[in-house]
Amino acid sequence: MATLKIAPTLLNSFDFYIGCPESWKVKAYEGLVSTIKRAPFKPTPEITKGLNFEDQVQKRVEGCLQFGWKNHELPGSTEFKIVVDRCMYGKFQVWGERTYDVPGYGKVKTAGKADVLFPKGSDHFQYGKIIDIKTTGNFKDERKYTESWQPLVYGMFWEIPYFQFLVAVWEDTGSTKIKSLKAINMKLDLETAEERIVNQITNFYTWLNLNGLWEDYFHTYCKNPR
């Protein structure tokens, strides 16, 4: 049975292409099409560094809970230890998904993994909380994060309106030393979330058809047989 699916990263790429300056259009289009066609992707050193940071946070949390480690007595920067404390007692790498009815196309599945999830009813967050850990060597402002589709899509997985980005800012792009930590707190409007997500998917599908990319999306991105 054919399946339609979409990740918030693809919606972000589409948003970026539509809204970017004309001088960036060619590069933005190429990046969007590469995602649709699942072009081979080699993680950049920055991405690898970020993944390693997330892994270190998870291992520190697990060590504290399983073996009684004292976070603030162990090596690491103050910023790193704050991230660990914020994630303590949360569940790491939790898979979530939700299906939407998109007029003219049928059911479309969204899916992804939360870096850290505090489910509803947890001892530490009664109404639940989702944390996403980010790293960057060049923090400009919060809009890169707050305007992303990730919080809204992920919030709908578990119907949790509280989302937090923890952004570790390196001293520079080549460094592994944290200069500062940004906590970006969001309260999501889940009442309008489904309508917004469905509208965005519909706009994207219209664009795919107008640009002759539906078959690539349907067969390559969604992995439906030809």
Where do the protein language model's features map onto the residues?
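Metal-dependent nuclease catalytic cores that hydrolyze phosphodiester bonds in DNA/RNA
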Residues: M1-S122
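Metal-dependent nuclease catalytic regions and adjoining charged, substrate-binding loops involved
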Residues: T9, I160-R226
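Conserved catalytic cores of phosphodiester-cleaving nucleases, focusing on short active-site segments
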Residues: F53, G112-F139, Y154
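Short, solvent-exposed loop/turn segments at secondary-structure junctions
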Residues: T99, T136-N138, V169-D172
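Short, mixed charged/polar active-site loops
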Residues: K107-A111, F125-G128, T176-A183
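Active-site-adjacent loop/helix micro-motif of nuclease/hydrolase catalytic cores
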Residues: F139-T146
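An active-site-proximal "capping" alpha-helix that borders the catalytic cofactor pocket
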Residues: E147-W158
